[in-house]
């Protein structure tokens, strides 16, 4: 496929420059939100005759606009090829243009969706024309197309492709901030993966404390609104790696968005354990470590996945269709889903309104692998549990494992490939034990957490689910959660004051009895003193007589 872009500059920008007065000189460039993101590069505008509007049809519609499948050609002398056009609503046009600038700057990378240019349509307004990925998203493959079998070789290949793209961002001091399965598009019969959706992409010199991203893959420090860096993308890689191996949802889908975020940020909630090779589990656990310093870098991830891809080299073998026992074919074009686009649907938990009734129990995924086929292990799934795992119950454990005839030395090399030289194996996802002298503080913290979770379950106090790509929505969500935390502090203080009051009232009769005894003692001492005084007087009178 020919992907060379237009070199023709924007006609509108040319006309603007010819009629605009010369700008006043400035002393220093002002850093804006787009600083460092291809500010000097012009994205070509695609003329109308290069788009086949008669054969365009809608793929999806969301809050931010619509996506259409169309046909695109470089010029009248070229053949049409499949393409996608992403149109934006007027209020999100700036985000779309900014995303286009990022994609244009990264267009040479083989694992980043390619952009052909900007296109203005009379019906939908400004849009971005990009290559069409005919196999949908990784999320659709993992969750919706369970009849398609893939192997650990394919997982290694996909993760290598993702790490290669992420390493390119990080080398340029840039962060994606919303890595997830929905933003990983597939083509070439599911074997080639490309990243898309750069609406939250930013440069590292910006102040990064806003909680942007998707809740399932959002790093703890992002939700805590702490300063974060490229290591937030590494956390997302760890969750994505788990999803590919387990082929299941990492958390209970009945868990509310605030409850999920709060538990991830404060209680070190992570996806359930999988019975898989430690070569894999050790690495994705290191990626989602609560301490960003303990996570590997993108370069170390790329090194690890390169070694994994070398160990499992059959990633180019066609995926198998379990229904036909034949290599999988390219799926038919997707149809419009009124509920919204996959990439614009927000968190993927619940609806866009109030969160559903919160549940703090997790469904345990059950990853099972079939027998080894062609030196690879096919990933399949048992049916999901029909009910949440209640406290005290033991969910069915994973029975399969990624195991192969590998030597211990090879396994050690793979395990160490992506691990930083200074990093050590981190503990499991369980919270560390509480010191004995800190149990009172721990009890107070647990009580505060319980109050906070109760606020998240209450219809009057729980926040509306945030829109992952809307800065105002995320800010409102964060402010609401912060207010709930402050409210929880106030309720806990009130509870402690009432507890102290009740304790004082319960001890009040004892206090009154104690006061009465003291008064009685004082009275008796005075009477004894009087008797002694009178006794002394009688003795002196007797002596005189």
Curated annotation (Swiss-Prot):
Its EC number is 2.7.11.25. It comes from the Eukaryota. Residues 352-369, 396-411 have a biased composition (Polar residues). Residues 1-35, 316-444 are annotated as: Disordered. InterPro entries: Kinase-like_dom_sf, Prot_kinase_dom, Protein_kinase_ATP_BS, Ser-Thr/Tyr_kinase_cat_dom. The keyword Nucleotide-binding applies. Interacts with, and is activated by, tap-1. This is Mitogen-activated protein kinase kinase kinase mom-4. The lineage of its organism: Eukaryota, Metazoa, Ecdysozoa, Nematoda, Chromadorea.
């Amino acid at each position: 496929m020919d992907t060379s872009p237009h070199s023709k500059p924007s006609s509108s920008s040319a006309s603007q420059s010819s009629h605009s007065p010369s700008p006043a000189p400035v002393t220093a460039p002002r850093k804006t939100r787009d600083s460092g993101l291809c500010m000097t590069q012009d994205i070509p505008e695609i003329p109308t005759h290069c788009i086949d509007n008669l054969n365009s049809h809608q793929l999806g519609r969301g809050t931010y606009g619509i996506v259409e499948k169309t046909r695109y050609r470089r010029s009248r002398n070229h053949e049409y090829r499949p393409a996608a056009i992403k149109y934006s609503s007027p209020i999100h046009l700036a985000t779309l243009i900014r995303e286009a600038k990022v994609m244009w700057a990264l267009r040479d990378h083989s694992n980043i969706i390619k952009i052909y240019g900007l296109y203005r349509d009379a019906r939908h307004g400004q849009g971005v024309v990009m290559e069409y990925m005919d196999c949908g998203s990784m999320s659709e493959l993992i969750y919706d197309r369970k009849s398609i079998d893939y192997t650990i070789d394919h997982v290694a290949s996909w993760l290598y492709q993702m790490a290669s793209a992420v390493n390119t961002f990080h080398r340029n001091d840039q962060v994606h901030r919303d890595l997830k399965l929905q933003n990983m598009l597939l083509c070439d019969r599911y074997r080639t993966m490309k990243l898309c959706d750069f609406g939250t992409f930013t440069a590292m010199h910006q102040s990064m404390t806003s909680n942007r991203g998707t809740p399932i893959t959002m790093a703890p420090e992002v939700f805590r609104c702490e300063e974060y860096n490229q290591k937030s993308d590494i956390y997302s890689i760890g969750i994505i790696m788990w999803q590919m191996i387990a082929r299941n949802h990492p958390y209970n889908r009945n868990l509310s968005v605030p409850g999920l975020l709060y538990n991830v940020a404060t209680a070190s909630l992570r996806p359930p354990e999988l019975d898989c090779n430690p070569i894999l589990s050790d690495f994705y656990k290191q990626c989602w470590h609560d301490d960003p310093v303990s996570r590997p870098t993108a370069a170390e991830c790329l090194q690890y996945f390169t070694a994994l891809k070398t160990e499992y080299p059959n990633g180019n073998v066609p995926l198998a269709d379990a229904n036909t026992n034949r290599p999988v074919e390219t799926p038919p074009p997707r149809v419009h889903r009124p509920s919204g686009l996959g990439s614009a649907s927000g968190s993927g938990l619940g609806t866009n309104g109030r969160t559903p009734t919160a549940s703090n129990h997790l469904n345990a995924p059950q990853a099972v692998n079939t027998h080894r086929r062609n030196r690879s292990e096919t990933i399949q799934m048992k049916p999901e549990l029909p009910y949440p795992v209640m406290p005290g119950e033991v969910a069915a454990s994973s029975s399969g494992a990624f195991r192969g005839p590998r030597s211990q030395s090879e396994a050690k090399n793979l395990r160490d490939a992506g691990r930083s030289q200074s990093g050590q194996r981190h503990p499991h996802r369980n919270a560390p034990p509480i010191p004995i002298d800190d149990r009172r503080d721990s009890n107070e913290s647990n009580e505060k957490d319980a109050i906070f979770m109760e606020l998240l379950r209450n219809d009057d106090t729980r926040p509306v689910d945030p829109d992952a790509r809307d800065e105002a929505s995320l800010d409102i969500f964060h402010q609401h959660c912060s207010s709930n935390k402050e409210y929880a502090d106030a309720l806990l203080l009130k509870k402690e004051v009432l507890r102290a009051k009740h304790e004082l009232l319960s001890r009040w009769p004892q206090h009154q009895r104690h006061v009465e005894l003291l008064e009685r003692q004082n009275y008796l001492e005075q009477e004894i003193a009087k008797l002694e005084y009178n006794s002394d007087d009688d003795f002196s009178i007797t002596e005189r007589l």
